[in-house]
UniProtKB/Swiss-Prot annotation:
This is Beta-ketoadipyl-CoA thiolase. Transmembrane segments: none annotated. SUPFAM superfamilies: Thiolase-like. The active site is at 90 (acyl-thioester intermediate), 357 (proton acceptor), 387 (proton acceptor). Catalyzes thiolytic cleavage of beta-ketoadipyl-CoA to succinyl-CoA and acetyl-CoA. GO terms for molecular function: 3-oxoadipyl-CoA thiolase activity. Belongs to the thiolase-like superfamily. Thiolase family. It comes from the Bacteria. It catalyses: succinyl-CoA + acetyl-CoA = 3-oxoadipyl-CoA + CoA. It comes from Acinetobacter baylyi (strain ATCC 33305 / BD413 / ADP1). GO terms for biological process: 3,4-dihydroxybenzoate catabolic process; beta-ketoadipate pathway. InterPro entries: PcaF, Thiolase, Thiolase-like, Thiolase_acyl_enz_int_AS, Thiolase_AS, Thiolase_C, Thiolase_CS, Thiolase_N. Pfam families: Thiolase_C (PF02803), Thiolase_N (PF00108).
Amino acid sequence: MKHAYIVDAIRTPFGRYAGGLAAVRADDLGAIPIAALIERNPSVNWAQVDDVIYGCANQAGEDNRNVGRMSALLAGLPVEVPATTVNRLCGSSLDAIAMAARAIKAGEAHLIIAGGVESMSRAPYVMGKSEGAFGRTQKIEDTTMGWRFINPKLKAMYGVDTMPQTAENVAEQFGIQREDQDQFAYTSQQRTAAAQAKGYFAKEIVPVTIPQRKGEPVVIATDEHPRASTTLEGLAKLKGVVKPEGSVTAGNASGINDGAAAVLIASDEAVAQYQLKARAKIIASTTVGIEPRIMGFAPAPAIKKLLKQANLTLDQMDVIELNEAFAAQALACTRDLGLADDDARVNPNGGAIALGHPLGASGARLVTTALNQLEQSGGKYALCSMCIGVGQGIALIIERV
């Protein structure tokens, strides 16, 4: 079996909903980290890239018709370089990286760009067609996140709980208290604030320049979503999203965000040919399915399955990047895995509650952040995992070279 190496990884800042990146189209946003990879790796013959695999969860607006291909062309890759778009909802870009690794390990490719993009601010409203002439049954759906154009049969079979409702379901089923969720969210904000203060994320972010009608361009160089001023007292005052007395709030859930990330993955031959530095090896990946109504718990079985598959243990993981869709589901997973609520290996620089969660880009962000953390700490293994809407989980392990 051949090896698949991560040689570079970069991302945009993650923008707040209707924030600094809201003016940037999804395809333009997706092009930015690809263009950064091109600039950062001048020794590569970019016409020889075997594929671009990009994740995107929406694809209902400016990210339609294969946004991976659009972003690749906009970034300046030669037309000979193919591209595709993957949709495993929140896990899309982590899946893209896994797909790239499998192709390289199988000897079918030597150089692949994998990543993802999401502009949740620019997600459109869409309206279906009438089933008959002069019909009045059309519905307008908001595509920002969650269900749309629901199939009645699927609703009858599994229900179509909203994402916050699935988190409430997890909290109730696994006994995750509101106070613990708020503490987890507070820790995420504090860790992110500390990392930002140290300039930790600067090495993984390519600034985004946004032209203005008048005056100088605006440059977005840092993540917009973190709230360093968050307090436990402030979190405790927030009302539930699903119901006033509920435990899931806007403060202990991830954000609605914009962003993109890209990872350059190479074979042994490509590393040697282009004199690249292999930074990490992609060891293994897996996916699982569970009941959609508790989708947030899916990382737990995904991680267990992957560790068995890779013949590794959780104790061997030096970094664990667990996407914080909601504090409730993150805690349900860590507790099921036997981890302490404040385990220093879990999201050591904060997670999606603080940094944000632009769906199709988040998985590649996890890998990028985990890679940098391994290099900074001298660790060997990093585990990245995410829950996925409609009841799936995904996990991937990398090893620092």
